[in-house]
Amino acid sequence: MNNKNLYQDEWEKSPGYVYFIGAGDPVKAVKIGVTRQKGMMQRLRHHQSSNHEPLRILAVIPFESTERPMRKAEKKEKELRTKFAHLQRFENGWVGSEWFTVSDVLLAEIDKIGIKPKERGIRDSIMIPGPGLDRQGGR
């Protein structure tokens, strides 16, 4: 097995999450993504460092009790992105296409199928608002 196949095999066998990250307060957009469970906070840090809006994890869907949890997580992520394609903020396949405009239907689906981060022992945010950020996202 070559290195690429070894990495793919390790990735697929890792416990994972489909995650929903909300941008803004109140939430204006939702990112639907997938990551290994051990990398969830690193993903949030990565996204927050390149986003001027406060980000927080709205919910996660854990995948861990199958032979290849990440493969199942990726399949679920694709299903959700397809289901909410009409809310996609950027053209499919381009940078940013994992971001969706918030809607009552999307938030209801997240509440229905997701688990709150606190229930998994995950912090929902890594930022502390500064003096230049009010509740409407600006001054």
Features from the language model and the residues they span:
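Non-catalytic accessory segments flanking enzymatic or RNA/DNA-binding domains
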Residues: 1-139
